[in-house]
A protein has these predicted regions:
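Flexible hinge/capping segments at coil-to-helix
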Residues: 1-31
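A late-sequence structural motif
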Residues: 16, 39, 95-139
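Alpha-helical segments flanking ligand/cofactor-binding loops in enzyme cores
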Residues: 24, 68-69, 123
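Ligand-binding clefts/hinges and TM-proximal coupling segments of bilobed small-molecule sensing domains
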Residues: 37-47, 53, 129-159
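Hydrophobic hinge/microswitch elements
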Residues: 37-97, 153
């Protein structure tokens, strides 16, 4: 399932209504980031490092919810999975910035051992996740067929 990462701001932020914001412009902003080791933070650091963009970190936090609340309070910008901010977008508490080269596409996978039969509970969970993913596909936020990322080997490990 695809999980696009987007940059969010409070609705009144100066960048909120601009189009195709250049990446270099983001160097002037303060970012609220996840803790070291977080997949979101790793994707963010890799993306900006590859483009030689250096962001200012205002605060490290341990949850997406803390980033959402801090961004809403005007403490900085955040990078979050689009799937985690639907309610805030609907309530107009956050806006997704239109940034060049965005969104960053991440992928979530569900795996289990080949040939191993899933328990009834595991099967119910598997079916539930796939059902939810199919609903997201209709919204354009997800894809249920796993595809290998061009920067990974056949096992999904970074090259």
């Amino acid at each position: 399932m695809s999980a696009p990462l987007v940059i969010v701001a409070p609705p009144g932020h100066p960048l909120a209504h601009l189009k195709k914001i250049p990446l270099k412009r983001l160097q002037e902003e303060v970012f609220l980031v996840r803790e070291p080791g977080s997949g979101t933070r790793s994707a963010m650091e890799r993306f900006f490092a590859e483009r030689e963009i250096h962001l200012k970190t205002g605060m490290e936090v341990g949850s997406n919810e803390a980033i959402k609340q801090s961004v809403q309070a005007g403490l900085g910008l955040g990078l979050l999975s689009r799937a985690t901010i639907e309610q805030e977008l609907e309530l107009k508490r956050l806006v997704v910035l239109d940034v060049a080269e965005f969104p960053i596409m991440r992928h979530w996978y569900m795996v289990h051992r080949r040939g191993k039969r899933l328990s009834p509970v595991a099967r119910a969970f598997h079916d539930f996740v796939l059902s939810e993913a199919k609903q997201l596909v209709g919204s354009g936020l997800a894809r249920t067929k796993p595809q290998r990322h061009h920067n990974t080997d056949r096992a999904g490990r970074p090259k």
